[in-house]
């Protein structure tokens, strides 16, 4: 007995340990038990008592003690001689009743032990099965059956797999092939075995009672056959089937797997086919099926037929009352082994509605009406189920009663896919029509259900989570990896994850020992999660953990919808903001099946509108296609700029040029990929430099009448025949001149010939006609008077006197040889390819929409339309404002040019080189064409309140409005510095009061400065600060000098040498190039040789822009001066409103340089040592203040105002001293002065090279201004 005491003390010491109990402790207890094996009865009793009295959490350790003792005993003495197992089995029922008082979580452990016992034949299956049933809530037969059924039902709620994995349940899930393999002998043996068991005998007795009751025709049968009997039948049947199943070699684990899979299958989670394949592999023994087969075919068939012939109406009501509170009928857990319970499953319609999806409501009424038939026909129903097995599975979703049946169908049903049941159907009494209807339903739903399952399976393979109705699924592709070794590198993670697929990013957080791995595809991340979470994978020395991580794109407000198990954020549709949709995909993906179709339409509506515009005018599209060779289109963000032009909005776009995203190709002026906002578009070797345009190609000829009325660049408000909707559809990229020239887009490509005309009533156009006749303008085509009635209502532009109230009116003379749909409005000289029309402005007092005069001075080489400021009181004016109509007396309303006074003002039409193409820019590559000023700026007059769609003042500064006729490079689009909106511009440039100084119209030899300035800002100014271009760009741009200097072309001097003879210029051109090669001082400009009149000047000017920027670039730039210099002066001024010059004017950085003038009194020699000799120069300038004035005016007779504007100091100190008082430059022509300068400044020049030229030019301009 000492051993027993020792054992007891060991056993009860379990209470001192906190579960789970260690293996060592269990070993000690087992050893003590084996030592006391002689007193095995005491040992067994002690264990049973311990289990009975211990706390719930020690129940399972008590079971483990039983297991350990029994197995050790069997191991030592052999199975036959073992005494412990039989002793434990004597009282095992009560022991397990005590065990099942354990916490709910531990029940699965008890079941696992039972399954192991069953597998290893520790106890007989007859012993184990009731214990398993107890786990399932079915008490052993001694307990009252009714209670049993209730507990079963309560514990076995649908939708959640039953906790215990009992063979009774496993039997339900047998696949057909096994059933078909069963031999008759097996079946008979199984039936015999069942019938011999005590439960089998009870079942036989029950059947006999039923038969006896059935033979007596008394109505009291119903009392005898009460619910308890039926439930007892069920319980017995379940036990029997399970017992028979337990006899075979099915492993408990496999049972669990197959049961779970089959259960899932019954609930139709879409995984069934995969799982059934797995379960077929996992459970190789076909013998289970014979049990259910035999049970169904023999015993229950008889019972079913007997019960079917009785009137069970009252019984059904009884059962309904009993089972109403239960969510599921007891049969749900046992029906697999019990075929007749259809007679006893009356609550199908009502008790399982929680299964139903919304469509179930529709069927409830049918269920209620048909329940009588369902019950009365008992077995019929089963037979029909057999006949239409698969279809019923689908119907499960929509019909509650079919659902319960589909779960309860036994393997017999599955076997009979061959429709073998059709034979039996003939013998049944039932409503034929109902069965036919059911068959139709099932056949219809079968294919759709199969498709749904396949789709679901596909989704699972892709790692996609289940779809929820009216919910957006944002599936994460980001995985959280935890417990990462702190020494692990990104490469370690890459090596681990790249086998699963492409990795988008890895974000490691070493202090926390975790990382976020974002995969490109959801499927890859899903596979990685599956594999890495199942095994113990190490990175470094640590085993990693892995889980789904919320993807970056899901904002905080949506985090509440995150499901970490599925790795998906389920966002209800009503909570989704369409703007956030694109962001959701960051670090994840949007499940397209869950996207609301309405969002797509919302998102695509804007671009669709734009397409309307392009498709509406075939001619316009045709031209665009010819014009542009680029296939890239601007990215969608451009769409945000698009403002539909409603009739109340001025037709000239108030935003920087853009074009509809829907256009097949970008308009000519845009570079294929937009350059950064302030950088010049990079050079494209396949494209000619800006000044060299290919020969004009006439636009395609389209007969006028057939052309739709859409005017792509709505210069004029569309006439009334265009509905506002169509106007809205015109993308406002079309309202603006995207390219460098007016040509392609300024005028409507669809303009019919009849609409472009010169009404004889206007005096000025008639004056113009003589000039035009030089160019063979057929009077019939251009000058025929058109009376409004004879103009088609769709005509986009009509001429009319500016004061008229008509809504249309563009005065223009069409170029004779341009086809009738010519894009050019205005006077188009025949030989000037680049002169695009200048759109006239409406007089300020005009209340009416359009009425644009196109009067172009043909010699304006830049040729783009002048942008003016719309008169403040024009409520709804469309059209670019350019030259003011001759009879408009109030010039102040136009920020533009002086009104032409007649033919004498129109300069000769011969411009040797093409500045800008006048035709649709057919061969011009997008990046190199300067952009027309018009489209760039809102037509705002200073003082007009900003309109709604206007971008911030930094883009639209009124003061920066360029002087007339300058195309600008695309790069300058947004280069304006931030300034107060509509702040006054540079003096003398934007103010209309001195128009005469602005455009010397009649002068043949004088190159119009506005053109030069806008077209080609000097490369220093244009590129030095904002956009340092690669050398080759500069090189190519600079090299082609000769064509630009073509005969008869006005000399393109630097800004300052406006009126100088061309020869001088050319001299200078050659010099600077040498200088920057390092040879300039010694070779190009030998010190002994006196400076040429402008040499000193140019050098200074040139260096200045260089001053503040990176030296390498500037020095290089200087090297190519020789070829380049012609362009520089031209391109520089062209920047007048943009680029560096803008910065010079308005940038704060300029002030320090201006202040240097205050330091002039410093020693002059000190200046030489400074790069660029700034201080030295300042001093010289101050010294020589008086002499320059006369010179300045000599040089720039009419252009002082323009001079000043052009040479606004540039950013970073380039030309900062522009306003410095007197520049020495003009002095150059004075020999004395010049010698002095040369002598004093020689050292400086030697050091600074070209710098001298640049700066002195700047000086001249400032002098000019002060003189003015």
Curated annotation (Swiss-Prot):
Gene3D superfamilies found in the cross-reference section: 1.25.40.90, 3.30.70.330
RRM domain sequence ranges: 477-551
Which residues are annotated with the PTM Asymmetric dimethylarginine? 915, 925, 936, 1071
Listed GO cellular component terms? cytoplasm; mRNA cleavage factor complex; nuclear matrix; nucleus
SMART domains given for it?
RPR (SM00582), RRM (SM00360)
Annotated keywords: Isopeptide bond, Methylation, Nucleus, Phosphoprotein, RNA-binding, Transcription, Transcription regulation, Ubl conjugation
The record's principal subcellular location, in a coarse class, is: nucleus
Name the source's superkingdom.
Eukaryota
Q: Where is this cross-link: Glycyl lysine isopeptide (Lys-Gly) (interchain with G-Cter in SUMO1)?
A: 18
Q: Does Lipoprotein show up as a keyword for this record?
A: no
**Entry GO MF terms:** mRNA binding; protein domain specific binding; RNA binding; RNA polymerase binding; RNA polymerase core enzyme binding; RNA polymerase II C-terminal domain phosphoserine binding; RNA polymerase II complex binding
Function of the molecule: Anti-terminator protein required to prevent early mRNA termination during transcription. Together with SCAF4, acts by suppressing the use of early, alternative poly(A) sites, thereby preventing the accumulation of non-functional truncated proteins. Mechanistically, associates with the phosphorylated C-terminal heptapeptide repeat domain (CTD) of the largest RNA polymerase II subunit (POLR2A), and subsequently binds nascent RNA upstream of early polyadenylation sites to prevent premature mRNA transcript cleavage and polyadenylation.
Subunit and interaction comment: Interacts with POLR2A; via C-terminal heptapeptide repeat domain (CTD) phosphorylated at 'Ser-2' and 'Ser-5'. Identified in a complex with CDC5L and other spliceosomal proteins.
Official protein name in the record: SR-related and CTD-associated factor 8
This protein's species is Rattus norvegicus
């Amino acid at each position: 007995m000492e051993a027993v005491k020792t054992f007891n003390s060991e056993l009860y010491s379990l209470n001192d340990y906190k579960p789970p109990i260690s293996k060592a402790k269990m070993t000690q207890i087992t050893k003590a038990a084996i030592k006391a094996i002689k007193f095995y009865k005491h040992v067994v009793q002690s264990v049973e008592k311990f289990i009975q009295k211990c706390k719930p959490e020690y129940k399972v350790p008590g079971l483990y003690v039983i297991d350990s003792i029994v197995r050790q005993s069997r191991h030592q003495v052999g199975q036959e001689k073992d005494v412990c197992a039989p002793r434990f089995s004597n009282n095992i029922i009560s022991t397990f009743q005590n065990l099942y008082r354990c916490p709910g979580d531990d029940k699965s452990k008890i079941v696992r032990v039972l399954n192991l016992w069953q597998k290893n034949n520790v106890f007989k299956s007859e012993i184990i099965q009731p214990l398993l049933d107890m786990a399932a809530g079915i008490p052993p037969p001694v307990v009252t059956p009714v209670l049993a059924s209730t507990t079963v039902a309560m514990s076995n709620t649908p939708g959640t797999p039953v906790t215990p994995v009992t063979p009774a349940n496993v039997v339900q899930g047998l696949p057909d092939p096994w059933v078909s393999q069963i031999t008759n002998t097996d079946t008979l043996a199984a039936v015999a075995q069942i019938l011999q068991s005590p439960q089998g005998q009870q079942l036989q007795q029950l059947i006999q009672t039923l038969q006896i009751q059935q033979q007596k025709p008394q109505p009291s049968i119903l009392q005898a056959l009460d619910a308890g009997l039926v439930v007892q039948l069920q319980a017995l049947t379940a036990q029997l089937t399970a017992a028979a199943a337990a006899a075979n070699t099915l492993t408990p684990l496999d049972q669990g797997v197959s049961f779970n899979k089959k259960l899932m299958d019954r609930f139709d989670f879409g995984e069934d086919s995969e799982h059934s394949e797995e379960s077929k592999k996992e459970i190789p023994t076909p013998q289970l099926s014979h049990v259910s087969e035999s049970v169904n075919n023999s015993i229950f068939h008889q019972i079913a037929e007997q019960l079917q012939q009785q009137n069970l109406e009252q019984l059904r009501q009884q059962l309904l009352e009993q089972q109403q509170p239960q969510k599921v009928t007891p049969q749900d857990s046992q029906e697999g082994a019990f075929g007749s319970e259809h007679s006893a499953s009356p609550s199908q319609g009502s008790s399982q509605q929680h299964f139903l999806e919304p469509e179930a409501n529709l069927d409830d009424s049918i269920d209620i009406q048909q329940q009588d038939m369902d019950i009365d026909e008992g077995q019929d129903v089963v037979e029909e189920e057999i006949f239409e097995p698969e279809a019923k599975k689908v119907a499960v979703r929509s019909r509650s009663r079919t659902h319960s049946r589909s779960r309860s169908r036994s393997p017999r049903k599955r076997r009979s896919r061959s429709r073998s049941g059709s034979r039996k159907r003939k013998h049944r009494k039932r409503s034929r029509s109902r069965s036919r209807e059911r068959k139709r339903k099932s056949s219809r739903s079968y294919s759709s259900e199969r498709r749904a399952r396949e789709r679901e399976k596909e989704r699972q393979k892709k790692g996609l989570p289940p779809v929820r109705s009216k919910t957006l699924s944002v599936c994460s592709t980001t995985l959280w990896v935890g417990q990462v070794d702190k020494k692990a590198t990104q490469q370690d993670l890459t090596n681990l994850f790249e086998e699963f697929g492409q990795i988008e990013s890895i974000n490691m957080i070493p202090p926390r020992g975790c990382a976020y791995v974002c995969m490109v595809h959801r499927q890859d991340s899903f596979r990685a999660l599956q594999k890495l979470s199942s095994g113990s994978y190490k990175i470094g020395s640590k085993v990693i953990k892995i889980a789904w991580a919320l993807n970056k794109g899901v904002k905080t407000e949506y985090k509440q919808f995150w499901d970490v198990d599925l790795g998906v954020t389920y966002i209800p549709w009503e909570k989704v903001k369409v703007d956030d949709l694109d962001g959701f995909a960051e670090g994840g993906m949007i499940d397209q099946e869950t996207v609301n179709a309405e969002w797509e339409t919302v998102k695509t509506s804007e671009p669709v509108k734009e397409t309307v515009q392009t498709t509406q005018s075939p001619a316009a599209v045709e031209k665009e296609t010819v014009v542009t060779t680029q296939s890239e289109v601007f990215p969608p963000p451009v769409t945000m700029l698009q403002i539909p032009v409603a009739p109340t909005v001025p037709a000239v776009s108030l935003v920087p040029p853009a074009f509809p995203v829907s256009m097949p190709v970008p308009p000519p002026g845009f570079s294929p990929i937009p350059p950064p906002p302030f950088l010049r578009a990079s050079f494209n070797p396949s494209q000619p430099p800006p000044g060299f345009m290919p020969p004009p190609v006439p636009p395609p000829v389209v007969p006028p009448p057939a052309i739709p009325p859409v005017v792509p660049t709505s210069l004029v408000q569309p006439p009334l025949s265009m509905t506002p909707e169509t106007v809205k559809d015109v993308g406002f990229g079309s309202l603006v001149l995207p390219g460098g020239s007016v040509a392609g887009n300024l005028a409507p490509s669809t303009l019919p010939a009849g609409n472009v005309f010169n009404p004889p009533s206007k005096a000025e156009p008639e004056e113009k006609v003589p000039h035009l006749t030089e160019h063979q303008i057929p009077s019939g085509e251009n000058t025929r008077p058109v009376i409004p009635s004879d103009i088609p209502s769709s005509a986009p532009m009509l001429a009319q006197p500016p004061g008229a109230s008509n809504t249309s009116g563009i005065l223009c003379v069409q170029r004779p040889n341009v086809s009738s749909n010519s894009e050019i409005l205005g006077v188009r000289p025949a030989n000037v390819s680049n002169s695009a029309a200048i759109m006239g402005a409406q007089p300020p007092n005009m209340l009416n929409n359009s009425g644009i005069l196109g009067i172009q001075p043909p010699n304006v080489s830049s040729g783009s339309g002048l942008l003016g400021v719309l008169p403040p009181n024009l409520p709804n004016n469309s059209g670019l404002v350019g030259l003011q109509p001759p009879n408009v007396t109030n010039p102040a309303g136009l920020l533009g040019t002086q009104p032409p006074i007649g033919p004498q003002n129109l300069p000769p039409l011969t411009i040797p080189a093409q500045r800008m193409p006048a035709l649709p820019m057919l061969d011009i590559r997008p990046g190199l064409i300067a952009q027309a000023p018009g489209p760039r700026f809102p037509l705002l007059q200073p003082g007009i309140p900003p309109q709604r769609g206007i971008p911030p003042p930094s883009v639209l500064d009124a003061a920066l409005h360029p002087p007339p006729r300058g195309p600008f490079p695309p790069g300058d689009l947004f280069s304006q510095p931030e300034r107060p909106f509509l702040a006054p511009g540079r003096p003398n440039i934007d103010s209309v009061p001195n128009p005469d100084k602005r455009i010397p119209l009649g002068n043949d030899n004088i190159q119009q400065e506005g053109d030069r300035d806008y077209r080609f800002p000097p490369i220093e100014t244009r590129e030095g600060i904002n956009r340092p271009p690669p050398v080759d760009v500069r090189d190519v741009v600079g090299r082609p000098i000769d064509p630009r200097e073509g005969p008869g072309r006005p000399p393109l001097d630097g800004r300052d040498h406006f009126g100088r003879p061309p020869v001088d210029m050319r001299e200078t051109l050659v010099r600077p190039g040498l200088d920057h090669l390092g040879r300039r001082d010694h070779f190009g400009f030998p010190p002994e040789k006196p400076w040429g009149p402008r040499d000193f000047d140019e050098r200074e000017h040139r260096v200045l822009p260089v001053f503040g920027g990176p030296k390498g670039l500037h020095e290089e730039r200087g090297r190519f001066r020789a070829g380049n210099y012609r362009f520089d002066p031209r391109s520089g001024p062209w920047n007048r409103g943009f680029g560096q010059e803008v910065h010079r004017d308005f940038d704060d950085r300029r002030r320090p340089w201006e202040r240097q003038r205050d330091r002039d009194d410093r020693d002059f020699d000190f200046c030489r040592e400074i790069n660029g000799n700034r201080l030295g120069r300042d001093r010289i300038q101050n010294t020589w203040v008086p002499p320059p004035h006369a010179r300045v005016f000599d040089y720039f007779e009419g252009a002082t105002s323009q001079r000043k504007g052009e040479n606004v100091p540039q950013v970073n100190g380039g030309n900062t001293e522009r306003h410095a008082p007197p520049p020495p430059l003009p002095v150059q022509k004075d020999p004395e002065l010049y010698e002095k300068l040369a002598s004093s400044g020689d050292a400086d020049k030697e050091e600074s090279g070209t710098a001298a030229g640049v700066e002195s030019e700047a000086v001249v301009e400032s002098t000019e201004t002060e003189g003015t």
